[in-house]
Amino acid sequence: MKRGLFLTLFFLLILGIAGHWAWNSFGSKPNSMQVTNNIELIEIDHDVLIGLGNGFFVKVDNSTFMMSLKVLVKGEQVEHRVYRLKNGKSELVGKLDVPFVVDVPALWIDNEVLLFGGMNPGNITLVPVVYAYNPENGSMREFAEMPFRDYDQLSLLWDGSKAYLFVRFLNGNLSAYSFDPYAKKFQCLDLGFPEGFVFPGTSKYAAVWYKGKGYFVHGDRIAVFDPSSKNLVWAQVRLPDKYWARTAVATDRGIYIFGGFDDNVNFSRNIYLFVPENNTLTRVGTLPYPLGQAPGGWDGRRIYIVGGRGPGPNKYIVIFTPKG
């Protein structure tokens, strides 16, 4: 599985470069374009040629997000940039030249981004440290040490006051922890995992908090975490396709699920709406291009999906406005 993940990342990079030229050959418009009546594309930045992957993505308040991306810019320069996304517009805040910040689970607290781990350069294990990053002044400091080592996958749920971490170790074992960022305290949870829940890292951008519970979109299934009973069980619904690294975004009408890729690196354009209250799943649209491994957020009116990987241009922010 580890070798497969590395090969997948390599293919995703090649697809992203190919997608950039293919998309441009169709005459895409600069800045922004209206694809359908409820999907719009806006450029991450005017000088970004290709998106090469995400670093972190956090919600600051009801209308503002902070994010980092690895991008190829004009002049063939690769940069790690930090942007503020507000009301459908991205604003360059600075640069974050820290190599381990690659698809890192993160949350926002007290004007800082808490980064949970990250890639260990030259090593398949992840960094066992929580860092606090201030995007306004560019400072980074060690915030807390995580109570576990030798892990290669991590997914995070944030309920607004406490984080829940779901960890996969190198030997394939799974564990869950709660983390109080105000007390800087971790606690190991006595949590059983349902059969088939094996790759929490593939749900990194598909783990959401919705009405008091956590939800993981995991392949063609959805796992439900109840913090009161410390249970993790499968929802009584299945997606019609099995894709990994989907995007999930919680809204006031349910959880929207976007894209993803399968074991053969075929990407999806499907958009689904899952309503946990009645366990219904409905296909509600199509992405403008195949996309996976992209973070997303909801500002109360629109859903934003940023960067990601796939055969599309990946230099856009997809803005999806739910109908109705």
Curated annotation (Swiss-Prot):
Kelch repeats lie at residues 112-160, 254-301, 303-323. The keyword Ion transport does not apply. SUPFAM superfamilies: Kelch motif. InterPro entries: Kelch-typ_b-propeller, Kelch_1. The keyword Transferase does not apply. Keywords: Kelch repeat, Repeat. This is Kelch domain-containing protein PF0436. It comes from Pyrococcus furiosus (strain ATCC 43587 / DSM 3638 / JCM 8422 / Vc1).
